[in-house]
From Swiss-Prot:
Belongs to the RecX family. The gene is recX. Modulates RecA activity. NCBIfam families: PRK14135.1. This is Regulatory protein RecX. InterPro entries: RecX_HTH_1st, RecX_HTH_2nd, RecX_HTH_3rd, Regulatory_RecX, WH-like_DNA-bd_sf. GO terms for cellular component: cytoplasm.
Length: 263
């Protein structure tokens, strides 16, 4: 049975040592593993001992990788698991590492979900539907997601949706009232808000143009349509412009008035 003939510190990593069996280099381990397995000069090691020691060292190395990954921000269990797999850590070691991390409270999917909802609803303005999908991708259970989202009240959602709507209004000044409403709805759906929240937000948003603003928007869209269809006053080009403006949400009366003025 081989025995340890030498233990030497590594030059480039003071936390690791090299183990020599029968005067030949065998493997290296973390100092904590050295202590855990009581490795010392003269100790005999059989094949199973070596396998167990190397497994313990794999766990220790993986644990350090996980701590480094967690040092930047909170992570879900799945995020850490995926990271360790990419780093080449064995599945059996990952299972033990995750258990250790949870035991030390470095991993807690309930706290992660709550923090994720709190942060992203404020910084990115995301609605519940988007937050739910993102947390699912991070491996959070449905029950924990719903629990985290319960802090995002209906009134808070409407308030957030109204802020989004106001941003759309500032950006889309050349649209008809109908198109502006559609733009707001589409934006809020993409952000992850429910139709009930969107409906409530629209009631608190002044998206309808006054007569002057609607006419100004129509003229801008009308000039654009005339260039596109080569408007020459003919029935054919007039109908193309008319259909274009109608699809944009302008009233027939306003469109006819515009075209009559253009001749």
């Amino acid at each position: 049975m081989p025995y340890i003939t030498k233990i030497s510190a590594q030059k480039n990593n003071e936390e690791r040592v090299n183990i020599f069996l029968d005067e030949k280099y065998a493997f290296s381990v973390d100092l904590d593993v050295l202590v855990k397995f009581d490795l010392r000069k003269g100790k005999e090691l059989d094949e199973l001992d070596i396998i167990e020691i190397q497994y313990g060292d794999d766990v220790k190395k993986g644990f350090k990788k996980a701590l480094d990954y967690l040092s930047y921000r909170m992570r879900s269990t799945k995020e850490v698991q995926d990271h360790l797999k990419k780093k080449g850590v064995a599945d059996s070691a990952i299972t033990e590492i995750l258990h250790m991390l949870k035991g030390y409270k470095y991993l807690d999917d309930r706290e992660f979900a709550a923090a994720y909802v709190s942060t992203h609803r404020k910084t990115s303005g995301k609605g519940p539907d988007v937050l739910f999908r993102e947390l699912k991708l991070k491996g959070i259970d449905d029950e924990l997601i719903h629990e985290a989202l319960s802090s995002f009240s209906f009134s808070d959602q409407v308030e957030a949706a109204v802020k989004h709507a106001e941003k759309v209004l500032k950006k889309e000044k050349k649209l008809s009232s109908k198109e502006t409403k559609q733009a707001i709805e589409q934006h809020l759906v993409r952000k992850g808000f429910s139709f009930d929240v969107i409906s409530a937000a629209l009631q608190e948003t002044d998206y309808e143009n006054d007569d002057g603003a609607e006419r100004e928007a129509l003229e801008k869209q009308g000039e654009k349509a005339m260039k596109r269809y080569g408007y020459d006053g003919s029935y054919e080009t007039k109908m193309k412009v008319k259909q274009y403006l109608f699809r944009k949400g302008f009233s027939i009366d306003l469109i006819d008035q515009f075209l009559d003025e253009k001749g």
